[in-house]
């Protein structure tokens, strides 16, 4: 009934399919409307706040199925995430001097992030031509355009090859080093145990356990909820996790 995210750390949200993890993300970011309950971000009430305003307030998210604009270039996809777009209005668009400097700053920031995520050579390609893993990188890079305080990643490792998975892991840990708070959903318990500072476990729409990774992985309620038929195994044993 109560969920908090520690600042400047990596919190993992885990649980079996259907536990409510993505629904929780949707509620927190304004994509769905809850029937009851309250929630705050950075001391501000977030009830009835629209998704685009949530992002401007510093809470951004990615999706299980990447949301890239296939018919826009990679660079244009990045620019969609820029928080300041003074040339969008009809009147201002007629006067380039009012927005050209900011637009150039947005482009420079986007290119710097594409360089960081090893996508700079793709900046002029259509986003639809990217591989699934590259789209994951693009979505994470775009999420950083508004300098968020909290980044919410919904299964960032799903469907990517081992090399890209390691790249994504490095980027997530780099965010923590930079002081950005990270909340991510993941099914790879072994990976969660190695990079998360705090773990929250959901099952059937409820929080069943939370704490540091080692203690959570040994919680009988977690083992029962998350592994079912494998409830007798030790989640702290790497060899067992590899077999699963």
Predicted segments, located by residue:
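Conserved ABC ATPase "signature" region
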Residues: 90-122, 152, 170-173
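Helix-to-loop junction immediately C-terminal to a conserved catalytic motif
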Residues: 29
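The feature captures the beta-strand-to-loop junction immediately N-terminal to the Walker
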Residues: 14-16
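Conserved ABC nucleotide-binding domain
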Residues: 47-48, 113-131
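A short, surface-exposed alpha-helical micro-motif characterized by mixed small hydrophobic
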Residues: 192-194
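Conserved ABC transporter NBD signature motif
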Residues: 37-44, 56-57
